[in-house]
From Swiss-Prot:
One of its GO terms (biological process) is mesoderm formation. This is Homeobox protein vent1B. Residues 17-66, 88-134 are annotated as: Disordered. Induction: By vent2B downstream of bmp4. GO terms for cellular component: nucleus. It is found in: Nucleus. Expressed in the ventral marginal zone of gastrulae. At the end of gastrulation, predominantly localized to the ventral region of the closing slit blastopore. At early tail bud stage, expression is maintained only in the forming proctodeum. Residues 89-99 have a biased composition (Polar residues). It holds the Pfam family Homeodomain.
Length: 270
């Protein structure tokens, strides 16, 4: 028989030595947790709605599976904190600069507009315009009298009038400017009302007793309806010098005798 080189005690001793060596090697190695790297942000993750308490990061993180050894273990789910996830994404090489700027703008606090001092149109309710001066009837009466006397005041006259009315020179100057503009508008309105509206008169043509000298186009001129000729109302007395008069009797008789008895020299040439 072949002698067995291995006994039970030897096998047990070797197994104990291997177990001790395994413990030493495990104690010398650092513990590395099985935590896979998170995926880079996608368009869906970038545009998903965010909440204030950070629940969206925990709800939408992807579950990962970690296998230890050949036999395999149960699935382990990893949910990183929002701060760690933000640091990991910020250090990723695949994350572009444009995306980081967008995230920074989204995460940065925006100035809150105070709507108490603004109305619904966005305009400030606090009136920044200069308040109008309310003149008393006595002041207006004196200003009107000064304006009727002189429409343009000098520096000394304006100062004197402002002192008498207990007003500032700027107020007096502004009132005179507005009063001149008002007077100018009144004059323009009066001139516009005095100008009569244009009247369209019918087109007239000269009168020709025998008709128009040249034939005219029917569409070029206005043709009144045909009416019988009416003599002018005023009586026309012709000049006697241009009316032919009958010859006297003796002139007619002398002319007849000459025609009946021609002179003798006429017979010579016949």
């Amino acid at each position: 028989m072949v002698q067995q080189g291995f006994s039970i005690d030897l096998i047990l001793a070797r197994s104990k030595e291997e177990a001790a060596d395994g413990k030493d090697s495990m104690s010398s190695r650092p513990h590395i947790p099985c935590a896979p790297q998170p995926l880079p942000p996608t368009k869906y993750a970038k545009e998903m709605p965010r909440r204030k308490d950070g629940q969206d990061v925990q709800e939408h993180t992807t579950s990962f599976q970690c296998s230890l050894g050949e036999q395999g273990n149960k699935l382990q789910y990893f949910s990183p904190s929002p701060a760690a996830l933000h640091r990991t994404w910020g250090s990723s090489d695949e994350f572009s600069s444009a995306g980081s700027e967008d995230d920074t703008n989204e995460c940065s606090p925006r100035p809150v507009r105070n709507f108490q001092d603004t109305d619904h149109n966005g305009k400030s309710t606090k009136s920044d315009r200069r308040l109008r001066t309310a003149f008393s009837p006595q002041q207006i009466s004196k200003l009107e009298q000064a304006f009727n006397k002189q429409r343009y005041l000098g520096a000394s006259e304006r100062k004197k009038l402002a002192t008498s009315l207990m007003l500032s020179e700027i107020q007096v100057k502004t009132w005179f400017q507005n009063r001149r503009m008002k007077l100018k508008r009144q004059i323009q309105d009066q001139q516009h009302s005095l100008v009569p509206p244009p009247v369209c008169y019918p087109q007239t043509f000269p009168y020709y007793p025998g008709g128009f000298p040249v034939p005219l186009n029917s569409g070029s001129f206005y043709q009144p309806p045909a009416l019988p000729f009416q003599a002018p109302q005023h009586s026309y007395i012709p000049d006697q010098r241009f009316i032919p008069q009958p010859l006297p009797h003796h002139v007619r008789m002398s002319g007849a005798l000459q025609e009946q008895y021609p002179p003798l020299f006429r017979a010579q040439y016949i």
